[in-house]
Amino acid sequence: MKILVLNAGSSTQKSCLYEIADEAFSTQASQPLWEGKINWTQDRGVAEIEVKTATGATLQESISDDSPQAHLAYMLNTLSDGDTKVIDRLSEIDVVGHRIVHGGEDYRDSVVITEDVKKAIASLSNLAPAHNPVALSGIEAIEKILKDVTQIAVFDTGFHATIPDAAAIYPGPYQWVEQGIRRYGFHGISHQYCSQRAAQILGQDVASGRLITCHLGNGCSLAAIKNGRSIDTTMGFTPLEGLMMGSRSGSVDPGILIYLLRYCDYSVEKLDEILNKASGLKGISGVSSDMREVRKAIAQGNSRAQLAWDIYVHRLRSGIGAMVTSLGGLDALVFTAGVGEHSAEIRQAACEAFGFLGLKLDLQKNQQKPVDEDIATNDSAVRVLVIHTQEDWAIAQHCWQILKN
């Protein structure tokens, strides 16, 4: 079975093609036959396209004066044409899976995409404006390029559907609940994959134990996972709540927003722009939303960069502590995504706060660029794992299961 995965971001479109045996889905992530990525400039008029294959073939091109859907079509044509060809015809693709950031209350399990599903994705775009519209654009592009191929929506909110009401419902008027305003949580595909991979690494049943998964990228969230089910998470009604992030503020006192609107002549649009794109590491440091650049600035004596680091670490530790109380203890702490996987300093800073739980980090292992490894000492009461998140593989798994069922 050939499965194409589309993972749409606010300024990127990542794609992978997997070939998976029809009779059984491997528990180990396999290397895709083909990987493609589109990076758009701010005006989306220029696309930087990168393609690579499992055999080592590569392609890099810049395309301008065309639509994003045309850019996607161009990239997908490299599947069956040129040096990066891995299939004879695009019609060989059996199914296309899409990461959909927000599924709302109605869509929690992965589903075959219909007109009703497309309408729901569109209606939820105001809750995930950077992601749902571009995902919908990708769905519509596939309809034109691959015609009647089955398309499947895999929702980032789905894994968190098991969060109990006490953790999911905000303490506002009950009318909010009736309007669907509640904690949905995000990065669910990543959190679920990492919980399953952690069980494999530790040799345990996925439906046992107490895990906290730390998805730390440009967007950041934590999930408390008990016996394989999400019971709490830091992101909420939108991906803006929770930890300090690259350019997003995370949680702030709502009174600040009222103050800015009432007394500082802020519009809703300006507030939205600031909270999502000019806050977090970028807003505090004045340097970058990229943790690597912030670290470089700290080394050069930049006090604002140091403050950004200190706030980031404080909020990460506080968030982990809150998840520990939801779980009633902790068996394993998992780090994943760009910062979580690659910043030994962040992992060490986070773990230092939890020595009282018996957590002991092996400092040497932590520095050795671990991938899918346990980096706690042998006598640590809490295991500490670094896991390379494989969202695309997880989406392919959902697609395979739906077609088989």
Curated annotation (Swiss-Prot):
SUPFAM superfamilies: Actin-like ATPase domain
Active site, per annotation: 156 (proton donor/acceptor)
Enzyme Commission no: 2.7.2.1
Keyword Nucleotide-binding: yes
Keyword terms: ATP-binding, Cytoplasm, Kinase, Magnesium, Metal-binding, Nucleotide-binding, Transferase
Any one Pfam family match given in the protein's UniProt record, by short name: Acetate_kinase
Cofactor details (free text): Mg(2+). Can also accept Mn(2+).
Site (Transition state stabilizer): 187, 248
Binding site for substrate: 99
Known catalytic reactions: acetate + ATP = acetyl phosphate + ADP
Complexes and interactors: Homodimer.
Name of the molecule in the record: Acetate kinase
The species this protein was found in: Nostoc punctiforme (strain ATCC 29133 / PCC 73102)
Gene: ackA
